């Protein structure tokens, strides 16, 4: 399922790939623990791979013709090969939940919240589970038509710049309940 911008596509498979965990690979060097991510990152234009439960999210550096990349074929071939999706070494030296919570809270307070405050918004860290980050947006960010762009291009990039091995970054915001969004969502 491609994103509206065409730079991200989610592939759901019929089995858990990483139950109760996630792994993010922003380049081939980071993908040494995942033969599948390494192969996907070797495809021209592929910028990152996120593996979580039964979904692979592949991001390109620009809008691409997803069917032409044949990523589904690569995934199917790998699933039948018997090779691990992500080796155990990926999870061996992840930062602790406490360290992640401290670092991300500090980042939100120091950089992210001052930036979104100009639009009347704020972002709060709700929880860390393993290496997954749960946030909530409020004020002008809640229900804002640009909230997804803010999350993906601002918040996510800042968090991954600080802690590259963070897994999923999940927005728990009830955007439909936003009372004063900075930009009205398009219908």
Where is each model-derived feature located?
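Domain-level signature for proteins that mediate thiol-based redox and metal-cofactor handling
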Residues: 1-187
């Amino acid at each position: 399922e491609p994103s509206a911008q065409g730079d991200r596509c989610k592939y759901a498979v019929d089995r858990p790939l990483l139950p109760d965990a996630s792994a993010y690979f922003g380049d081939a060097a980071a993908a040494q623990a995942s033969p599948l991510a390494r192969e996907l990152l070797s495809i021209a234009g592929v910028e990152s791979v996120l593996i979580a439960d039964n979904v692979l999210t592949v991001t390109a550096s620009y809008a691409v013709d997803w069917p032409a990349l044949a990523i589904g074929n690569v995934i199917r071939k790998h699933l039948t090969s018997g090779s691990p999706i992500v080796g155990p070494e990926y999870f061996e030296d992840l930062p602790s939940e406490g360290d992640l919570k401290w670092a991300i809270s500090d980042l939100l307070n120091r950089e992210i919240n001052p930036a979104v405050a100009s639009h009347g918004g704020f972002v709060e860290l709700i929880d860390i589970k393993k290496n997954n980050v749960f946030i909530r947006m409020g004020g002008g960010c809640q229900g804002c038509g640009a909230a997804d762009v803010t999350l993906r291009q601002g918040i996510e990039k800042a968090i991954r710049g600080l802690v590259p091995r963070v897994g999923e970054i999940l927005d728990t915001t009830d955007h439909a309940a936003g009372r004063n969004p900075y930009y009205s969502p398009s219908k």
